[in-house]
């Protein structure tokens, strides 16, 4: 019985010592929190450490990218990817690109929570449809521009010819109309020589030589 009593007394003294030391430990923890504002992320736990309920160390990989004022960002990232996977992905990326990587993880996690089936693929397909619609619209606009350019080119060709005609009329020139094309003439058909008919030989008229000869003979005749 004496041994058990001594044991209980030792346990009671130990609990009393821990209870007396607890306020001093809490004071030591709270003192650094009232330090300079430049060490906000090293003293005040970041959103990741606050969610995971752990002390935020100075070399915390989440501290520069997950502010304690926006805890919902790391909450969505932790729910989709997990804290350990996010830490590995941030460590694999160069330090100059870690901020962009963290923002990308936040965006992808939010999209995955809104659309658990497709995730980012739904947003990508919607953007691709918009790109195709804009390309079709751009093609239609380019065809309309080409039509207007062709009309302007035709108009520039017609206007100089009209100005030349107007200048010709103003100068008092006479327009000469070209004669119509001549039709091809048919060659004359050859005429065939017909032999003289007997009637034409019998009833041929006397020539001037026969008349003169008849006058001479009538003068030599003497009717006594």
UniProtKB/Swiss-Prot annotation:
Gene behind the chain: LBD15
Ranges where the record places region Disordered: 171-224
GO CC annotation, single: nucleus
Sequence ranges of Pro residues compositional bias: 178-198
Any Gene Ontology biological process: positive regulation of gene expression
Any one GO molecular function term: transcription cis-regulatory region binding
Record protein name field: LOB domain-containing protein 15
Similarity section: Belongs to the LOB domain-containing protein family.
Ranges where the LOB domain occurs: 44-145
InterPro entries linked: LOB
Highest rank taxon of the organism: Eukaryota
Entry's transmembrane regions: none
Tissue specificity as recorded in UniProt: Expressed in young shoots, roots, stems, leaves and flowers.
Lineage, broadest ranks: Eukaryota, Viridiplantae, Streptophyta, Embryophyta, Tracheophyta
């Amino acid at each position: 019985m004496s041994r058990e009593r001594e044991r209980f007394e030792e346990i009671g003294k130990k609990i009393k010592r821990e209870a007396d030391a607890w306020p001093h430990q809490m004071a030591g923890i709270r003192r650094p929190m009232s330090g300079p504002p430049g060490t906000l992320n090293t003293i005040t736990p970041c959103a990741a450490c606050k969610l995971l309920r752990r002390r935020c160390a100075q070399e915390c990989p989440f501290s520069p990218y997950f502010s304690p004022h926006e805890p919902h960002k790391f909450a969505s990232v932790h729910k989709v990817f997990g804290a350990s996977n996010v830490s590995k992905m941030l460590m694999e990326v160069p330090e100059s690109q870690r901020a962009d990587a963290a923002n990308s993880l936040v965006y992808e996690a939010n999209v995955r929570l809104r659309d658990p089936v497709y995730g980012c693929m739904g947003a990508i397909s919607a953007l691709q449809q918009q790109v195709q619609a804009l390309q079709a619209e751009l093609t239609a606009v380019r065809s309309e521009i080409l039509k207007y350019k062709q009309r302007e080119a035709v108009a520039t060709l017609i206007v100089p010819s009209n100005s030349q005609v107007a200048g010709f009329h103003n100068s008092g020139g006479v327009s000469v109309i070209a004669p119509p094309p001549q039709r091809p003439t048919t060659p004359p058909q050859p005429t065939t020589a017909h032999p003289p008919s007997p009637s034409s030989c019998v009833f041929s008229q006397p020539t001037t030589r026969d008349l003169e000869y008849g006058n001479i003979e009538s003068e030599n005749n003497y009717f006594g």
